[in-house]
Amino acid sequence: MSENLIGYIDDQGNIIDTQSAGENCTARPIEFDNSEKSLEIIRHSTAHLMAQAIKELYPDAQFFVGPVVDEGFYYDFRVNEKIGEEDLKTIEKKMKELIKKKYKIEKYEISKDEALKKFANDDLKQAVLSRIPDETVSIYKQGDFEDLCRGPHVPALRFLHNFKLTRVAGAYLGGDENAEMLTRIYGIAFADKESLKSYLKMMEEAKKRDHRKIGTEMELFMFNEESGAGLPFWMPQGAKLRYKLEQILHKAHLVRDYEPVRGPEILKADMWRTSGHYACYGENMYLTEIDGQEYGIKPMNCIGHIQIFKQTQKSYRDLPVKYYEYGVVHRHEKSGVLHGLLRVREFTQDDAHIFCAPEQIASEVLEVVEFVDSVMKLFEFEYTMEISTKPEKAIGDDEVWETATQGLKDALKGNDLPYTIDEGGGAFYGPKIDIKITDAIGRKWQCGTIQVDFNLPERFDVEYVAEDNSRKRPVMLHRAILGSFERFIGILTEHYAGEFPFFIAPTQVIFVPISEGHAGYAYGLKKKLMLEGIDSEVSDKNDSLNKRIRTAEKQRVPYVVIIGDEEVQNNTVAIRNRRTREQYNLTQDEFMVELTKQLQEGKI
């Protein structure tokens, strides 16, 4: 057995650790490195190492769950003392001491009844056991520490040298906002020191780019806890940025033969029952009663588009029919997962639904992929695609799901477009392609999606007249390019660190007259630019020239234009170009040509 062997992958893509595999395992080996599967094992084991250290430092600690997550790992636990960020170094030190003891990580199994007796005085373990349907449970042990766990884990602590505990948070037991608040510590781990250093450097840069910090500095958006968590307010600068983004997408939809529509934001609950949302998504919906009838505020836009499609009879000649809407939706996200614009309870999707014949699936999916590609290139994002398959909670039979999933695979394979598979990650009504983008500092984000749906047309009896005059069901493609305006703007803000491209910058030009006598010239230029669709302002408040320039720089305005005697006399402008960091003078006409050229860069 190789010294670097830490597990195996079976034919279904499941990880088997060395403790579970046996000596003659024929599955594909997982070596100790920074591959996805290897990191999953390393990070899960580091979570247990952290728990062991916490137990030694705080003997009264009781542990709930410690999973691997996108940003590393965490453990939820109960402890009598308050643990803060300042305690993380002490816990890390203890973890390093434990590694030096060279403990192996061992696994044994007992019956669920035995486990209930073993952990009879630990209500958190009782809660974990209540969620396990199996009659046998596994326990992993290192030194004197042991914990309920299904694995996978590395063979020994010697693999866990490269880690960092990143933050302390609170977390409700089981995610239930009415339950007890536990302590949660997050961490990260890698196979080597250099990868850890690179990650920590990226996280330092991420702090500087935090969209919540930049959004406050640039006065883009705000939140008000008195009004409700997860409900953003768009301030004038943010609303201008958002409007520009909406307009770019609006024109791009029209040239691709989409038709704008709009549906109500609240529908009778029976509609959501028919669609399956009530049963499969009801816990995320806001429900209310009006005139004795139950209604649901929409969490998705698809039902409205179905009603519009059904309003008039459609022929095969009409297909594909493509509707798009900037649809406001509401979803009940738990307070613990809310995060600035990236996770909110009210948001606007750039949502579209394509009704097409089955034989049109591949061409329509490819057209959407082309649309995605043009948007991502515009904003300098690299991206990958992931096909997500049938989840546990789903509507429709397996055969329909298989047909839909294969349709997505065929569309991408047939055009040599690479993709990965996310087993069980689909929407409840159909498989999907998720668009994963990579930002300027290497972080990955899930944004757009393309979903194939045979189920909702069946449930709502959607039909079109075929060439032979028979009635047939269309296929429904759900798609969003950005995902939501809120999330995408949050990501854009961090991607560009607030230095937005000229064509979407909230204020694109700000004129700073040196004295009151120069203000008239500045306002004349502002009007000229505004008529050409260029957002401009005049900063003529009763502040010093330097303060007004600093304010414009803080707002990251692409062009700061100083107006003095020379500019007024010669009909010129003195420019400070934020992107190039250059200062230069142009005539009014030359300046207009430069701005118009940059404005044109925002077309897709």
From Swiss-Prot:
The lineage of its organism: Bacteria, Pseudomonadati, Campylobacterota, Epsilonproteobacteria, Campylobacterales. GO terms for cellular component: cytosol. Its EC number is 6.1.1.3. Binds 1 zinc ion per subunit. Catalyzes the attachment of threonine to tRNA(Thr) in a two-step reaction: L-threonine is first activated by ATP to form Thr-AMP and then transferred to the acceptor end of tRNA(Thr). Also edits incorrectly charged L-seryl-tRNA(Thr). Zn(2+) binds at C302, H353, H478. It catalyses: tRNA(Thr) + L-threonine + ATP = L-threonyl-tRNA(Thr) + AMP + diphosphate + H(+). Belongs to the class-II aminoacyl-tRNA synthetase family. SUPFAM superfamilies: Class II aaRS ABD-related (SSF52954), Class II aaRS and biotin synthetases (SSF55681), ThrRS/AlaRS common domain (SSF55186). GO terms for biological process: threonyl-tRNA aminoacylation. Coiled coil: none annotated. Keywords: Aminoacyl-tRNA synthetase, ATP-binding, Cytoplasm, Ligase, Metal-binding, Nucleotide-binding, Protein biosynthesis, RNA-binding, tRNA-binding, Zinc. Residues 210-501 are annotated as: Catalytic. One of its GO terms (molecular function) is metal ion binding. InterPro entries: aa-tRNA-synt_IIb, aa-tRNA-synth_II, aa-tRNA-synth_II/BPL/LPL, Anticodon-bd, Anticodon-bd_dom_sf, Thr-tRNA-ligase_IIa, Thr/Ala-tRNA-synth_IIc_edit, ThrRS_anticodon. Homodimer. It is found in: Cytoplasm. Its main location: cytoplasm. This is Threonine--tRNA ligase.
